[in-house]
């Protein structure tokens, strides 16, 4: 009987040993440019205007090879005047990134049009993630050639209305068209936090515009 009790205790100890074993949880995988990548909302001031001309939804992503010195930026103009709220104008181009300084730059980088554009104000609606077919992809009138950009992301650079810290983004940006014209903007904004109140300034501005 004593032998059976001893064997039972040994078996219980083995069960505890294996069932109580802890496993190290891997840290989330980060991109090589994780200090600058992500989704941002920003006001755009055209040609040095004192008041915002429009609002941009910005997405910065890493390259296919996850290069530490390069990335892609997609800039979507939320102004759908003359277009459609599901058909926004967007451009995408490659830029050089300094991951440590959290800066990015491009000079006359070739522009492509993404097939879809991120609109933060319809994100999650209509079974979507805020992405809809871009205007030119729908109607075939893109007309852009190159873009130049010079900017920086500051970690926790702004305090949001919810009281949280968010990364800030600021850059100058010029878009060139195939007819020889161009548009230049100064852009200032913040990373999307997921808190509704943090976007209230942008929402109110859009509502005032009737967009």
What do these predicted regions represent?
Residues 11-12:
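Repetitive helical segments and hydrophobic/amphipathic motifs
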Residues 1-7:
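Positively charged n-region of N-terminal signal peptides that target proteins for export
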Residues 29-211:
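First exposed extracellular module after export/assembly in secreted or surface-exposed proteins
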